[in-house]
Amino acid sequence: MKKLLKALLVGILVMTTSSAVAAKTTETFAVGNKTFLLNGKPFVVKAAEVHYPRIPRPYWEHRIQMCKSLGMNAVCIYIFWNIHEQREGQFDFTGQNDVAEFCRLAQKNGMYVIVRPGPYVCAEWEMGGLPWWLLKKKDIRLREQDPYFMERVKIFEQKVGEQLAPLTLKNGGPIIMIQVENEYGSYGENKPYVSEIRDCLRSIYGQDMPLFQCDWASNFEKNGLDDLTWTMNFGTGANIDSQFRRLGELRPNAPKMCSEFWSGWFDKWGARHETRGAEDMVNGLDEMLSKGISFSLYMTHGGTSFGHWAGANSPGFAPDVTSYDYDAPINEYGQATPKFWKLREMMQKYSDKKLPAAPKAPMPIIEVPKFELTEFAPLYNGFDWDYYGKHGDLLRTSGAPKTFEEVDMGWGMMLYSTRLPEIGDVKAEGVTLHPADKDKWACTLNLDAHDFAQVFIDGKYIGTIDRVKGEKTLKLPAIKQGQELQILVEGMGRINFGRAIKDFKGLIGSPTITGTIGGWHLSGVDEAKITFTPNRWENMRIPDDYEVAVKAFEMQKKNPTTQESISVPRIGRTMRYAWESEDLMFGRGYYRGYFDLKKVGDTFLNFETWGKGQVYVNGHALGRIWSIGPQQTLYVPGCWLQKGKNEVIVLDVVGPKEKIVWGQKEPELNKLQLAGPVTHRLKGQNLDLKGEKPVKEGQFKPGNGWQEVRFDRPVTGRYVCIEALSSHWNREYACIAEWYMLDETGQRLSRESWTVAYADDEDVSSGNKNADKIFDLQESTYWSTNRGVKFPHAVIIDMGQDKTMSGFQYLPRAEEGAPESIKDYRMYVKSDSFKF
């Protein structure tokens, strides 16, 4: 009888389990007439964008629950290729990278999942999520039908599918939609490539899996595939009807969705912390929900770009800070902000049930008293001698120095060294320069460093060449024969947006020295100007990771340095560097200290007295620091701390003012410590356009959207001056969101080499509204003058070299009515710079 009862119970349990699984698999999600359909009924997607690599795994569920308490019914996630395949062919979906577990946690908490598997994701993430090792193939064509690129993409997507295909809705999981590529219209026009990505995803997830592609209202038609759902991306304050107008004309019966509604914005080093108003965000979402428009709020919770994962923007080079707070409703450390509560109040209107309460934070916020990092190991202790021993021939090169990628290094630093000849008698094509002339003929070092180069001669600091500032030259002192030129290059995050994502690190090409130097290859003579190219380099890797830092301290214990000098072993010789404040080895290196805790909690370690580099706590890579700001603290999750002793290591490539650190309860995300101005107008500089003849003048139309103007005839020049004379809003300030110049065929000219030569006025007090916003590839950011500064206003663009142009395109702000849009204008073009 007992056996019979046991058998019956087992049978009932099996039937119950089977029924539960069957119930899950009966859910359906589809694209219907003007709406999405969940189980055959109209469904508005209310998604929260969150990124699992930016949240410590122990906090995943808390962040999901915070999104749920806002009234969201889904989470939207990118899949970061370079997190999962950091070395070619070596995949990791465990621990912090267990994206399948993240999806299961979402389902556990009643949330659906939208997956955006790239291969490119942007996200202000290193190389837009593409792995650096792709660049070991120098001629690779990224985000195109390059055979090697597509081969690796398909392998990666298949590996992701092994994790996530079992979790689609039809298989009882939470995944309802999958995105094809990402904002491809801002990169180019290539439907065959986008189609191949679509076909790859369909082969993995099935023909019935709803697929969509996202872009901007201005470019979505470039690559729109007929069999995919089209969604729009735009930010707070945008004119929502305008954003969907063209989509409605082309597909009147399609559901509308804003797949990225930008709640805030990202920060870059050397600029103020970005914020966006809560009212604009809430009103925009309210308007969309009232019209049945689905959305994903990017970001609902931003988190942190731990380690070296923060990317960089382009044109130019604008590296992102470690914090990805994004001014989102849920802040970097998982706390509800005023935006959160305002949004929650509005979202309650669209729920027939009371929204769940916000969950309790998993950790308290704690302070840490000041402590000093007393241990020091010089930078050369981090040299990768093992790699040098195995690949010495590669690292001792004839010709150009090696990039990081050429020596199989993704992140870190490289020390480049070469011997210098003597300034002396040089004869070339009738030009004779004597030692007595050395003060008249200063030497200039010319190089392209990606990204932060410090230059030394025999270990003595000469100066810095910073890619962020667009610097490529440095004056050198008089040189003696046999001295050694050393260039220490730190690579920051690779560019994540636009055509510049093919962002090699290190020295790019061959540095040259212009001046009176002999003994190198003579590459050109122009009157008394002689240019030489070094042809022998030593390239020393300094990888960026915790293990290297630990080895540096182990080496220090075995071979302690003194305060008098440091012996630096080299291949074939030993160099001795004096321990001086300007020396290569003084201050630059690894620092270690400890602090004790009686209670564990989240905290923000303050590094405002430090220089530039990376930080590790208990072996976890926290991220980058840089004294210029605006970020001065790093978020330390309490789950990475322990009661008792905790270790802090700082790799500082510049050197600290003070070796102290402390933990505070709130972050410092908006403290700039800049040496120079943040605007593009020098003190006392006034533009003089008298006598200049405009190539075009007229009036722009009022309202939103791109406008195109053609010149009467093609014009050629390097410098473009945009002069704004009045505003449609009858106020005394002007705004421009984006600006393109057109070539002779009417196509947009590349803006990669553009810089701002002058701007009469820039609003940097209420936000980062500098003039370079007019060519930053972002339609939601803009240049603005300050209130009360009278017309006319002017911006001068330096395109780098002469270009022949047939016209231009202008985009006003995206908000309804295009606030402060320019009315009357004049345009000037010159090959030479304008007068001041």
Predicted regions and their residues:
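N-terminal carbohydrate-binding accessory modules
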Residues: 22-74, 104, 600
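Aromatic- and acidic-residue-enriched segments that line the glycan-binding/catalytic groove
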Residues: 89-97, 108, 118-144, 194-198, ...
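Active-site neighborhood of glycoside hydrolase catalytic domains
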Residues: 149-225
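Aromatic, loop-rich ligand-recognition surfaces of beta-strand-rich domains
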Residues: 685-691, 699-836
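Catalytic-core region of carbohydrate-active enzymes that cleave or remodel glycosidic bonds
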Residues: 204, 237-331, 335-338, 342, ...
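Aromatic-lined substrate-binding rim segments of carbohydrate-active enzymes
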Residues: 60-126, 198-206
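Short beta-strand-plus-loop segments that form exposed binding edges in beta-rich domains
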Residues: 487-493, 650-656, 723-730
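Aromatic-lined ligand-binding clefts that engage carbohydrates, nucleic acids, or primary amines
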Residues: 427-456, 485, 595-618, 625-626, ...
